[in-house]
Amino acid sequence: MASQRSDFAPDLYDFIESNDFGEDPLIRAASAAEEGFTQPAAPDLLYGSQNMFGVDDAPLSTPAVVIPPPSPAPEPRGGKAKRSPSAAGSGGPPTPAAAAQPASPAPSPAPGLAAMLKMVHSSVAPGNGRRATGSSSPGGGDAADPVALDSDTETCPGSPQPEFPSSASPGGGSPAPRVRSISISSSSSSSSSMDEDDQADGAGASSSSSSSSDDSDSDEGGEEETPRPRHSQNAAKTPSAAGSPGPSSGGDRPAAGAATPKSCRSGAASPGAPAPAPASAPAPSRPGGGLLPPGARILEYLEGVREANLAKTLERPEPPAGMASPPGRSPHRLPKDQRPKSALAGASKRKRANPRPIPQTQTQAPAEEAPQTAVWDLLDMNSSQATGAAAAAASAPAAASCAPGVYQREPLLTPSGDPWPGSDPPPMGRVRYGGTGDSRDGLWDDPEIVLAASRYAEAQAPVPVFVPEMGDSTKQYNALVRMVFESREAMSWLQNSKLSGQDQNLAQFCQKFIHAPRGHGSFITGSVANPLPHIGDAMAAGNALWALPHAAASVAMSRRYDRTQKSFILQSLRRAYADMAYPRDEAGRPDSLAAVAGYPAQAAAAAASQQQPEAPAPSVRVREAYTRVCAALGPRRKAAAAAAAPGSRAPRPSAFRLRELGDACVLACQAVFEALLRLRGGASAVPGLDPSEIPSPACPPEALCSNPAGLETAALSLYELRDLVERARLLGDSDPTHRLGSDELRLAVRAVLVVARTVAPLVRYNAEGARARASAWTVTQAVFSIPSLVGGMLGEAVSLLAPPTRSQQPSSSSPGGEPFSGSAAAEGSLQTLPPLWPTVPGKQSATVPSSHSQSPQHSQSGGGAGATTATCCRATQTNARSRGQQHQPQKARSPQAAASPAHLSQEAMPGSSSDDRAIHGRPRGKSGKRRSEPLEPAAQAGASASFSSSARGYDPSGPVDSPPAPKRRVATPGHQAPRALGPMPAEGPDRRGGFRRVPRGDCHTPRPSDAACAAYCPPELVAELIDNQLFPEAWRPALTFDPQALATIAARCSGPPARDGARFGELAASGPLRRRAAWMHQIPDPEDVKVVVLYSPLQDEDLLGGLPASRPGGSRREPLWSDLKGGLSALLAALGNRILTKRSHAWAGNWTGAPDVSALNAQGVLLLSTGDLAFTGCVEYLCLRLGSARRKLLVLDAVSTEDWPQDGPAISQYHIYMRAALTPRVACAVRWPRERHLSRAVLTSSTLFGPGLFARAEAAFARLYPDSAPLRLCRSSNVAYTVDTRAGERTRVPLAPREYRQRVLPDYDGCKDMRAQAEGLGFHDPDFEEGAAQSHRAANRWGLGAWLRPVYLACGRRGAGAVEPSELLIPELLSEFCRVALLEPDAEAEPLVLPITEAPRRRAPRVDWEPGFGSRSTSVLHMGATELCLPEPDDELEIDGAGDVELVVEHPGPSPGVAQALRRAPIKIEVVSDDEDGGDWCNPYLS
């Protein structure tokens, strides 16, 4: 604004004299301005339009000098004080002068304005510069008042700029600050009665004065930049007088055009800072020479009068009775109706924004002793200046500094220091909604709101939809702040939180009844997301931290940032609010009380937590834990005497309960030992582990059996010792209070040894059972399992190891049959023992052979508490596999993928009790495992004596889904089928028996587990099981290599005995079993096998094929299509050199019969599926047989790691093993359907199952068999399919042209209907449909169903995972080659592989039709669109056209234009007719 420019009114005195203004007009003009009237002419130039002074700044009745109140007041800035001669004349530092006694203001009226002008003008002595103003001593500024220099920040026109110390500016090298002129209100008289907060707030209240806008304008654009005056060394030594609010003496007022730093608007300069301007600086004068302009002197005088009046009126008023100032707020900020009117008069906007209390004492301090203060910006104006100034009077250094990073625990107020507009609570019956101060009707009685309020009261996390009717928003705000700091996906949750059913209903209710009736989508609601409460709650509380969720949600809602940029902004918000959310004390430690000082609810909780008694020293706690251990395990004479009393019978815990507690004690001892070893770095450094210090048991075993509570107390005490040792390791270096000496560690070891020696008899002197039941070890076993089982095992471990509840009863009252999951300690503490892997109550578990030696007592026990030593991983893997494969019935029938030790023993025991069929209340599902799918029985190897005689089934150490009920077998009375598998004999297996033959040395694949290797089938049972016509005799030895396959066969021997003396019934060769045994008929002699291709089929994929169930007479379910995972269809497509799509003949869903792979079998290639019977045994059998003959087997593995069966085949490194990924996404038509130019391209590399892998395999085959015919893996002749064509429902394709003519043409012999002939022979069909020959002329040339060969692009390992075509960086010429190339069907052609980094060196192959065979272009139907591929000679004719491949139609089938183009050409049809002359024009097969 013009009024705020520093060059305004260069000579006010000359201006008044030249306009002949008298005293009376000026006084009348000022009085009219005070009353709110606007003068029409000259007076309006001085007061109204120029906006220099408002009526509340300088009332005309204000005396020139004011008598201070009882408490000393600062001197007015316009007061007169004489300089000492030395200061005036020499320019050195001024000496302190006595304060002038002010006159009484009562009898002296205010002089007229003209008289004041003459008085001030006459008082200026020539050559003296300007006089000291309003201070009793030079060096104005209050050392104890942080805002003493606030008046200096409001410079007036015609005053020089003061020099600022280096600490008053944020950077020493910063450019000159912008000009900040005074902003004084010139509003009407109604603004004088307005409270200081409303008038100072220029953005919130509608009644704010125009000075706010003027002030903001001056901040942005109406300011000038001038160089800062150089600092004076003399001024640095100028002492300051305390209590003076005026400018520093010895310095001059800022001159016209001088700049005031913006950083000092609110008192940034140090109160005791050196005097800004040098004393020796000459006084500024007019351009023509002379003294300072009188206009500047007038302005300075009036400013001093205003300062004096402000000092009088801003005394601390006494609050009304019963009315206390709110904490953190200045006591002057009272409600409007309670503020004295005098406190509002005479205060400018800047003074109202920073009210200063009257200092009680005036002390003089030298300038060099005053502390330097930090820069205060406008953002810090919300903090209470009054409180800070009062504290500064007592301690100047503490008040003058504003420590960075320490959050002021005060409400966040407006820049003027007032509460935010709209902070008042909404009216009765309404809640906040919309803009500032707006509200809407409350909906407390609505059922949706009532339910939401109940959910909000019980929620521990932020609710996804919040409305004010749900209750206090403090809980929601605090939860949102925690989520912003702790959640990785905070922004995603704020923007798109997942809504449950009830929350979704609430969101729809809010949209319908709250948001929709109130306008469009951009209507102001007060929050940008459903979880956020209204921002008015945060404004009313003055809580700056609650703005964090709103800021984060606003950024999350924005579409101008991507995910990474939003993450950066979120991290920035976290760092900016970190000191507020997690404050620290002066020492840098987290201050929990300071963190919640501004929030009553959190403060109460923090205070309660601070009042808790301090924990004893670690050494004391170690001794107490040792005492509890000895007391808990010691002999209890009272209990023993009560038990020995006649007629009394004390309750005794069950054996299961004791076994649980014994395992818990073992794990507790192991936890303490681990902590001690980590603390000391080794066992030799742990004191107390000396054999001579091993203590004796605390009580005999029989006393321990009646003391389960003592066992639990001992275990809890050991875990407490573990925690103390861990704290010593983690905190001992930084905090000596947590350190443990040698004596404490020795006592901890002593406690562990006491527990160990006392509990050892209870666990039969063996800790293997407890180790197998450790919950952490169970999870570790799960995550280290093979990829196909890791998901199921981990899920099973997590579900079974549920966290213990806090409401459980003590262990002494818990039933003995319940698994131990941790209960309250004897002292009533809430500590619980870590959960154990549950076991089946009352069951005997067999032992597992391990490298750890077992005592004779344990090995002979056969049962009891110590028999729980089976590793839990077996049960976990069993249940994980059975659950994970219930959705794949075909795969679930494979013994490799679904074996379990529990099923193994149960299925061979028809006499198992019904209790074994459901464990822990989980009945067997309909799709559960069949009894023929056992798991390795090696878990019973240690109990061979009881294996053959016990009628009970094997029960794992962990609960698993129980095996299904045995099928009803047709057996003779008294006949019971034997079990097929048993433990490995001690003397070793028989060579004719059934067991795993795992090669020695390293293997390409994971080695089977010990349990799988320990399974054994006696030779007499093997001979009976494999003697069946279903199994070719040459391949029967492979069955003996797979005990799981033998168990599967035994489970299906459910019929009556085939002959006398047979142990098993007759084998029921069902359809699934035949499909699984079909691989044995591929190659009759195992000696002819040279290459084995391993694959994992998708659901309902097998080499037998068959009609799908959707067709009449079909029984096979339609296989599932997958774009990501490849099965048998993808395997055969790669071996057959063709593209696999869902509509092509290569997909199993289109098969109507079994595919023909005899061409591959003739080359010695065996296709073996993971679901085939004896998959593991076949591979190991071939490896052994060929290795014994000194031949190497070539194994191509296309099974993904997730599908590799547990205990799969072990392939020795002696053989050649190649592994590659099998996926339909190698075809660009599947990966990028929209890239039409790549529809006939296929990606290949050495890691993909395709030509890249085949090239390596063919080279290795040539080295292994140099005299044999070369291996050809990627040829069209390798595979033939059985599909539905116009030649028949089960047509083998490709159908040779001769056979095609024999099967199709006779149907149209003698047919006179040419339209029927054209439709039946497919004259107007596309030449190729989904890559296969479809039209009559194409079938007559290459055969019906013959497929086009793809173009392979060698993309390398990185290109195989490309997400977009641009990542491949395909050259333009190569892309054009793929678009134009059309490789005609050729059964013996090699694959065309082109490097993706080079342009092709050959012309793209085309299809050319001879004259007389229709159109010269070839029509190709792919993905519902027909393309016309022109022959090569026409390529040069259409350079300027659309290209060689033109997209004609976008819907399935040929377009009318294509059909019309085909009809124009001569159509030649060969038919056998007796009554019609057939010419050459109708025979398309003539060459």
Curated annotation (Swiss-Prot):
Residues 165-193, 201-213, 235-272, 807-829, 849-860, 867-877, 938-951 have a biased composition (Low complexity). InterPro entries: Herpes_ICP4_C, Herpes_ICP4_N. Residues 920-929 have a biased composition (Basic residues). A long stretch of serine residues may be a major site of phosphorylation. It holds the Pfam family Herpes_ICP4_C. Keywords: DNA-binding, Early protein, Host nucleus, Phosphoprotein, Transcription, Transcription regulation. Residues 66-75, 273-285 have a biased composition (Pro residues). Signal peptide: none annotated. Coiled coil: none annotated. Residues 41-295, 310-370, 803-1007 are annotated as: Disordered. Its main location: host cell. Residues 988-1007 have a biased composition (Basic and acidic residues). Disulfide bonds: none annotated. The keyword Magnesium does not apply. Residues 878-893 have a biased composition (Polar residues). Belongs to the herpesviridae ICP4 family. This is Major viral transcription factor ICP4 homolog.
